[in-house]
Amino acid sequence: ADAGVDAVFFDCTNGSLTWQPEAGVTLAGGMAGEKYFLYYPYQETAKMAGKVNATDTTSDGDFFATLINDWQPEADQSDYTQGYTASDLMTATGSGSKADGKLSLSFSMTHRMALAVVEMPKTVYKFTDTSIPDYVIATTADFSGEAKPCRNTDGTYRYFVRPGQGNTVTLTGSYADGKKEFFITPNNISVSSYKTYKVDGAPTIDKDHNLQVGDYLLADGNIVGKDETLTEEQKASVIAIVFHAGHHENDASDY
């Protein structure tokens, strides 16, 4: 594609990619020898100066070689948008096809960095009422220092690093109210791959629990029975109390 077209927008929420050229730019499609290259996340034009090898179009790896070699993931990746996805450099080369006057572009993105996945110990509540599914809590960690990973919805922490050896970044974390510490220096992870680091072996702790109205839910996700005596720390951490809505076995009302 024209080297002057340096901005694209794509939406991966539904697995598709949509090319939106700059205003006034028309993609003709069907020209002999044309190639399309894509990178993410978008960088301002000034930051892309000298990052594209426009004469080397063998592959997107060659085309974006300078960008890839110079790329440095953010130190603080705790924010999903500003840190985590902003560190996830991806590139692609695409082919265009024209039908009914419309140009369609197909891309397959390649991750150019490596990913460290930090797995924490888990607590699994198994309720005496077997109709209630198990309740799983991944331990929350606190990270000090500049390197901070992003917490994923599955409870793991994820952090992008440059692939291979030579990383000096260390994830310094703690859990159990700071009583337990851990240190992880992600290294020897191949490009476009991930490596899992299990903190203290990431054990799973099973807890049998009889869930009752009046039980307490704490901010860290743990449950304290209604008949247990709460510590001052637990009292300050209560965010919800279990209750019952609607009829129950001892409710004879007709509302």
Predicted regions and their residues:
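Generic structural hydrophobic/aromatic packing signal, biased to beta-strands
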Residues: L38, V118, Y159, L171, ...
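Short, low-hydrophobicity acidic/polar segments
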Residues: A1-A116, P121-T123, T185, S190-G201
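Short, surface-exposed beta-strand/loop "edge" segments at domain boundaries and coil↔beta transitions
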Residues: T26-L27, E44-G50, Y125-T128, N167-T168, ...
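Short amphipathic beta-strand and strand-loop transition segments with alternating hydrophobic
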Residues: G94-K98, K148-P149, I241-H248
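A broad structural signal for short, well-ordered beta-strand segments within beta-sheet-rich domains
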Residues: M90, V124-P133, V242
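Short, compositionally biased
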Residues: S174, N188, Y194-T196, D200-Y255
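Short, surface-exposed loop and linker segments with low hydrophobicity and enrichment for Pro/Ser/Thr
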Residues: T26-G33, M109-H111, T153-D154, Y159-Q165, ...
